[in-house]
Amino acid sequence: MAKKVTGYLKLQVPAGAANPSPPIGPALGQRGLNIMEFCKAFNAQTQKEEKNTPIPVIITIYADRSFTFEMKTPPMSYFLKQAAKIQSGSKAPGRDKAGKVTKAQVREIAEKKMKDLNCDTIESAMKMVEGSARSMGLEVAG
């Protein structure tokens, strides 16, 4: 028989930097999970990632206080900021441009994010990336 799921927990944790301090410790501790077990497992799985890359993780919590976790790809805004070489998006996205990304960069980001996006083709994934870029105040060139 399968374990009974009691809940899910969504966190965004820097790659290789999971530790028991807030926000991870309190979030897991409230649910009675072993904080260090999660931190060690997460850090082991994110060793290949660039340090401090934000990794969305969905933790499935079971009735016997065990857990499993699934890691997603980093947020689209993270990839867009890296591609445009900026620290943050525009404060007024419709008027001010914060930077520029090319179609080639958009395609590369779409290919990285494809497994997490709700689409079938690379073209539709590119449209999602372009929309995110525009909402951050980035200009899509070429």
Swiss-Prot record:
Coiled coil: none annotated. It comes from the Bacteria. It holds the Pfam family Ribosomal_L11_N. SMART domains: RL11. InterPro entries: Ribosomal_uL11, Ribosomal_uL11_bac-typ, Ribosomal_uL11_C, Ribosomal_uL11_C_sf, Ribosomal_uL11_CS, Ribosomal_uL11_N, Ribosomal_uL11_N_sf. Keywords: Methylation, Ribonucleoprotein, Ribosomal protein, RNA-binding, rRNA-binding. GO terms for biological process: translation. Belongs to the universal ribosomal protein uL11 family. Part of the ribosomal stalk of the 50S ribosomal subunit. Interacts with L10 and the large rRNA to form the base of the stalk. L10 forms an elongated spine to which L12 dimers bind in a sequential fashion forming a multimeric L10(L12)X complex. This is Large ribosomal subunit protein uL11. The gene is rplK.
